């Protein structure tokens, strides 16, 4: 029988995280271990203080890192290295399983030996607005599907879509492909999904596996999130240069506007257009971030730590360990000429 570990990165977890753990423990296919990669211990300790959490959930392992250490790709990769199962289910702290068959349904996708990763359907919360509810339906339809390189021509960038808000990975395939990129602002799941497709493996979308997960972001938040998305695509032209996301975005806006008209919500169309404009503006700025002043980037990003880490990583490549000091521009030029 296959063994399964769960990985959950957390930062300032709340009651949804506790509900998530409780529902994971009630699954028809139980996880062997639940690995929590927590950023900033004080917030985690504050949540579980006096709850006997660790006594209640013996299979939960918690590892603490600082906010400065966190990276969307590297932190998840560190967690994967700690797993021992045949499969690893990655979730976010605010994704709540709808029923007790989440793991069972995701695991069923791997009956096809070519499937490297399977992701779940995300349903909106009861508090979600009309636009967010339709967006979830657009991105996570009621019909399951399996995607391969053959789908690139008609699905375009959606071939690579695979959200690790709730996604299960075949560990052998993950290791074969090198895992998540180790330094990224965002979008590590899609970057890895592209490697899956390009290597000949498949991605399964399991509509039967469901979690409640949605966000009603403000226009400013949408702009900043899509700025980070644009940065991730600009940093990986080998993946995204050949596929356009613009057509998919236009399709979403058009279909959402049509839906609002049909359901008597015409008053929300203006809000939709403003929100979509903020998304697109953020995305374009992110795609062209190398042309922007650093102070702009600091205002536009949701992930300031990424840029701090990025600067440190770039600086470390300039260190000559044989001399003990940073290389000058002249020394770098001489080395290239050699």
Predicted regions and their residues:
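Glycine-rich, basic loop-to-helix element that forms the pyrophosphate-binding segment
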Residues: 66-83
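Conserved donor NDP-sugar-binding/catalytic core segment of glycosyltransferases
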Residues: 100-133
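A recurrent flexible, glycine/aromatic-enriched loop bordering the glycosyltransferase active site
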Residues: 149-169, 185
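Non-catalytic, C-terminal membrane-associated alpha-helical segments of glycosyltransferases
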Residues: 228, 242-338
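Short beta-strand/loop segment that forms part of the nucleotide-sugar
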Residues: 32-42, 63-65
């Amino acid at each position: 029988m296959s063994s399964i570990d769960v990985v959950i990165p957390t930062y300032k977890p709340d009651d949804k995280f506790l509900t998530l753990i409780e529902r994971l423990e009630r699954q028809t296919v139980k996880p062997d271990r639940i690995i929590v990669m927590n950023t900033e211990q004080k917030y985690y300790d504050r949540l579980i203080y006096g709850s006997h959490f660790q006594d209640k959930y013996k299979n939960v392992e918690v590892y603490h890192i600082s906010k400065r250490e966190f990276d969307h790709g590297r932190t998840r990769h560190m967690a994967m290295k700690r797993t021992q199962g045949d499969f690893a289910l990655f979730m976010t702290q605010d994704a709540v399983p709808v029923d007790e068959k989440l793991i069972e349904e995701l695991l069923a996708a791997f009956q096809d030996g070519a499937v490297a990763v399977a992701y779940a359907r995300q349903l909106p919360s009861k508090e979600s607005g009309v636009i967010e509810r339709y967006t979830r339906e657009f991105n996570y339809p009621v019909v399951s599907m399996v995607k391969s390189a053959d789908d690139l021509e008609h699905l375009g960038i959606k071939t690579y879509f695979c959200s690790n808000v709730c996604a299960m990975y075949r560990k052998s395939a993950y290791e074969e492909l090198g895992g998540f990129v180790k330094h990224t602002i965002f979008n590590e799941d899609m970057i890895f999904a592209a490697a899956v497709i390009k290597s000949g493996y498949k991605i399964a979308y399991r509509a039967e596996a469901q979690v409640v997960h949605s966000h009603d972001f403000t226009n400013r938040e949408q702009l900043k999130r899509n700025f980070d998305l644009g940065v991730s695509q600009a940093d990986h032209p080998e993946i995204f240069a050949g596929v356009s996301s613009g057509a998919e975005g236009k399709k979403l806006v058009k279909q959402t506007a049509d839906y609002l008209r049909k359901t008597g919500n015409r008053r929300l169309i203006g809000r939709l257009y403003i929100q979509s404009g903020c998304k697109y503006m953020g995305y374009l700025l992110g795609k062209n971030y190398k042309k922007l002043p650093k102070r702009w980037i600091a205002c536009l990003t949701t992930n300031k730590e990424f840029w701090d880490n990025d600067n440190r990583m770039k600086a470390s490549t300039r260190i000559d360990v044989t001399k003990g000091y940073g290389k000058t521009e002249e020394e770098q030029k001489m080395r290239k000429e050699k």
